């Protein structure tokens, strides 16, 4: 029995070495990015609760944009990984073109929305339960931050188009290096511009936004310039700019398979943002506590998020090469490994997570809320790891309609109503509400297990 389990779910060293060589650069890249976000969050937090809350709300809105970009590039990446696995560089080039067009279109829409409805969107998260005018200040700081952050959306879109194509070829080092340089720049400029160190003026939340925008341009330039210099390693760039068309067959295939994925990312992100809005009716303290907790949680969930993302690349390449049994075998082992690593990280977060809120310059009530939110997130995290791995398994085989139902439809049918009803119509404390809403992940785990086990995702599409 044990031998059978080991054969099915435990790989040998060569297997894990291949997996980790792909995953570790991505984990390190995101670890550095989230660490700098954490430091940025602390520095903004030193300015006051209103500044921290205003910035947090805008970042929540930008999160929806980021996921829309992720959805746009992921739609083409379904085919990109399989095109590369098959050696079809022209097909890979068409998927790259699609990414550029889609991300720039999404960016244009986001900028227009922020320009016309920015104030109204931020105000949705501001409920004045105390009557001290703190919400008006949070709105003011949020608008200042948002105005500058919009300038950084275009380089982010271009960078994602290039970086995802580079990763599909198995080259994860350069995107990681670019990210390291960018986040290092961001961290230094944050400190200088937020607090007015040396010749720099004290810009507060505007300084935080400027630092982020400058870093995004640097990251995009590094990735784009490297890709064009090393054409031999990035053959999808051959002819990428000599024309602008995408053959109807390829475009239709990407849209049919990818549109549900794009919509899924947008609707899921919008759903999570709506859940946060539901929590926010309990007051500005809750917004601040959630901001601190999510920043800490993001430091610990990097491992399972990136291990899950690698599943779609590895399994996608096996499927593209027609190695269907190898794809199933690798998927089983990667899911188990991802969950195992997450259990370790969750235990660590549960033990040490409560120390982090004390770093922030805020009230004791907000620190206590943040500590409770962190503990709840640690308990639920291993279940999130399994559902996340299941999602990328289904996506690797092009089952985007299934992933749409699994992810965003689940969020809007189960999670959002639960958060809304509990926050608006019960007398439960916010921590109890948060625990119950997070606990809906258990339902998703069961659904994910059944769908992965059915092998509906074992499909060669190219």
Name these PLM-found stretches.
Residues 73, 77, 148-168, 175-186, ...:
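Short runs within selected transmembrane alpha-helices of multi-pass transporters and secretion channels
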Residues 27, 31, 35, 39, ...:
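Generic alpha-helical transmembrane segments of integral inner-membrane proteins
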Residues 26, 30, 42, 59, ...:
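Transmembrane alpha-helix boundary and packing residues in multipass membrane permease domains
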Residues 52-112, 156-175, 289-353, 384-403:
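Small-residue-rich hydrophobic transmembrane alpha-helices
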Residues 31, 35-53, 122-136, 192-203, ...:
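Helix-terminus/linker motif at the lipid-water interface of multi-pass membrane proteins
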Residues 21-40, 148, 159, 182, ...:
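Transmembrane helical elements of multi-pass membrane transporters/channels
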């Amino acid at each position: 029995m044990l031998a059978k389990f080991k054969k099915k779910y435990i790989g040998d060293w060569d297997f894990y070495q291949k997996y980790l060589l792909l995953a570790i650069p991505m984990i390190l890249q995101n670890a550095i990015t989230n660490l700098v976000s954490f430091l940025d969050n602390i520095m903004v937090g030193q300015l006051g609760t209103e500044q921290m809350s205003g910035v947090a709300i805008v970042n929540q809105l930008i999160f929806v944009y980021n996921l829309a970009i992720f959805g746009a590039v992921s739609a083409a990446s379904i085919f990109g990984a399989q095109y590369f696995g098959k050696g079809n560089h022209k097909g890979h080039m068409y998927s790259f073109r699609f990414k550029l067009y889609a991300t720039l279109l999404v960016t244009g829409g986001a900028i227009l929305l922020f320009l016309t409805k920015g104030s109204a969107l931020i105000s949705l998260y501001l409920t004045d339960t105390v009557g001290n005018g703190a919400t008006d200040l949070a709105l003011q700081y949020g608008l200042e931050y948002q105005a500058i952050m919009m300038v950084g959306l275009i380089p982010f879109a271009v960078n994602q188009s290039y970086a995802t194509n580079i990763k599909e070829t198995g080259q994860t080092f350069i995107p990681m290096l670019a990210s390291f340089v960018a986040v290092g720049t961001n961290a230094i400029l944050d400190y200088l511009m937020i607090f007015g160190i040396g010749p720099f003026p004290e810009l507060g939340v505007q300084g935080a936004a400027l630092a982020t925008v400058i870093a995004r341009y640097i990251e995009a330039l590094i990735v784009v310039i490297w890709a064009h210099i090393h054409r031999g390693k990035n053959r999808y760039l051959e002819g990428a700019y000599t024309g602008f068309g995408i053959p109807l067959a390829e475009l239709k295939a990407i849209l049919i398979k990818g549109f549900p994925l794009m919509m899924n990312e947008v609707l899921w992100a919008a759903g999570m943002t709506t859940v946060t809005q539901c929590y926010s009716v309990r007051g500005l303290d809750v917004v601040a506590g959630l901001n601190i907790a999510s920043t800490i949680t993001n430091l610990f969930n990097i491992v399972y998020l990136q291990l899950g993302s690698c599943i779609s690349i590895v399994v996608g390449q096996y499927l593209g090469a027609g190695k269907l049994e190898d794809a199933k075998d690798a998927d089983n082992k990667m899911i188990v490994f991802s969950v195992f690593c997450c259990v370790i990280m969750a235990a660590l977060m549960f033990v040490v997570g409560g120390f982090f809120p004390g770093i922030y310059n805020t009230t004791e009530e907000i620190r206590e809320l943040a500590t409770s939110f962190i503990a709840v997130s640690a308990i639920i995290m291993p279940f999130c790891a399994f559902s996340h791995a299941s999602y990328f398994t289904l996506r690797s085989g092009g089952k985007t309609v299934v992933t749409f139902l699994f992810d965003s439809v689940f969020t809007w049918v189960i999670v959002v109503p639960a958060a809304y009803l509990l926050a608006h119509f019960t007398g439960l404390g916010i921590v109890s509400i948060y625990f119950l809403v997070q606990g809906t992940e258990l339902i998703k785990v069961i659904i994910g297990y059944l769908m992965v086990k059915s092998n509906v995702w074992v499909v060669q599409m190219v």
